[in-house]
Amino acid sequence: MLDVILVSNYSMKEELEQSLKSNDYKFHDLMIQDINHIERYPIDDEYKTIIIQSANAIKKIDSSNNHIYNAKYIYGIGPNCRSWVQRKFSLDCIIPDHDYSSSGLIEKIKHDKYELGKTLLLKGIGGKTTIQNFLESENLDHNVCNVYERVLNEDNLHSVTAMIENGAVVIAFSKSSVEPLLHNSDINLDRLHFIVLDKSDEKIKCDKDVASMTKLVDIYDIPDIVEKIKAITK
C-alpha cells in the first residue's frame, strides 16, 4: 500500500491522519515549503475592505490587531481563509461560491458590486499578482502587504525524496507547496499520485507526467479525501 504524504499546511491534518490510519495507511506530515511570517500587525490603518489572498496571510496575524474589526468587508480566497478569520477574529469572511482561486475571488467581488473603498490586500512574497493587478486596473485606493514568505525545508524535501522512490500519494493544496518536488530531477513523477485543490487558474502539472492527478473541491471533506485515496490505491 502506498504511503500518503501531506506537503501542505492543513488545519485538519490530525483528523486526516486518524482517518487514514484507521484504514491502514501510513501518513506523513512533511511540509517542504515552510511559512515564515514576517508581519504580525499588517493591518496598520482603517480599511473598508480587507482581501486575504491565502490562509497563510491571516494565520499569524495577532488577534489584537484591532483595525480588522472595523473593516466592512473581508474577502478570502477560499474555505481555509474563512475558517481562520472566524476562528481568530469571530468575523465573517466572504469567499467565492465555488471557484477558490484569484480569478474566482475577483468574479465574486465584481458580482457583489460593493463599494470597496480603501482596501488592503494581504498576501505572501512571490505570490500571484492577479488580485493586485485587478485592484490597480480598477483604480481602487489600496495597499498591499506581504505578510509571509516561503522557505524551502531541505530536510523534509530529502525525506520525501527518499520516501517516494517506489511511489506515493502526495497531498498538496497549492502549486507553491509542491514545486520543489516538481523541479527535483531525482524524483520520478510518473510514480506519484497527486491530490490537489481544484483551482481553475492553477495547473500544477500536466496529468500525463504523473501517475494520476485527483482534484478536490472541499479540502475539509475528510471522508471524500480518504475515498479518493482508496480509489487510487486499490
Give the label of every model feature segment.
Residues 1-234:
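Signature of uroporphyrinogen-III synthase
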